[in-house]
Regions:
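Conserved N-terminal beta1-alpha1 strand-loop-helix module at the mouth
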Residues: 1-188
């Protein structure tokens, strides 16, 4: 999110607010405001430790969300400073055993739609495959979430399900949030 006024409004609605530091993203930011109520999350794709460390310091990040092929070791180092959210692209063939090597090194998983891009596709995968996830790490649901899915999400059950990641389904255009749509969705 680039519009600081929108960030302040979203902050009142969310527990986490993400800022994308992947330069190839149409949602890329290089400045972030201070947050009082939500945790500030830096979103990265295949970063170096030094790159993330620099952003943690410059932007006072509370958490990082990692969308690439980051190693458990990198996650472990970062977790000494901030919360770590490791993202996995999920499709019908996804092997949830691949998450186990991260269990001790992250705070949350985020299960998103598998695409060649690193999220933000607006496409939904079959969330029923998450019944195959038997791990201990809590997770966020992502992938094509939009207002019309409020009842589906409300009825989604899993013992490790902790929240949802709202992105492209709640934007006028990339990085331009539709605050009214967000408020209405959250109030439901």
């Amino acid at each position: 999110m680039r519009n600081f006024k929108q960030v302040k409004e979203v902050e009142l609605l969310a527990d986490f607010v993400g800022f994308i530091f992947h330069q190839n993203s149409k949602r890329f930011v290089n400045k972030t405001p201070k947050l009082k109520f939500a945790e500030k999350v830096g979103v990265f794709v295949n970063p170096t430790f030094q790159e993330v460390q620099r952003h943690i310091t410059i932007h006072s990040l509370d958490a990082v969300q990692l969308h690439g092929q980051e190693s458990p070791e990198l996650c472990s180092f970062l977790r000494e400073k901030v919360k770590v959210i490791k993202v996995f692209g999920v499709d019908k063939k996804f092997n949830f055993k691949s998450t186990t090597r991260y269990d001790s090194f992250v705070d949350f998983f985020l299960f998103d739609t598998k695409t060649p891009l690193y999220g933000g596709s607006g496409r939904q995968y079959d969330w029923s495959v998450l019944s195959n996830y038997l791990g201990d790490t809590p997770f966020f649901l992502s992938g094509g979430i939009r207002p019309s899915l409020v009842n589906t999400i409300r009825n989604f059950k899993h013992s490790k399900f902790r929240g949802i990641d709202l992105n492209s389904g709640f934007e006028h255009s990339p990085s331009d949030k539709n605050i009214d749509k967000l408020k209405k969705f959250i109030e439901q």
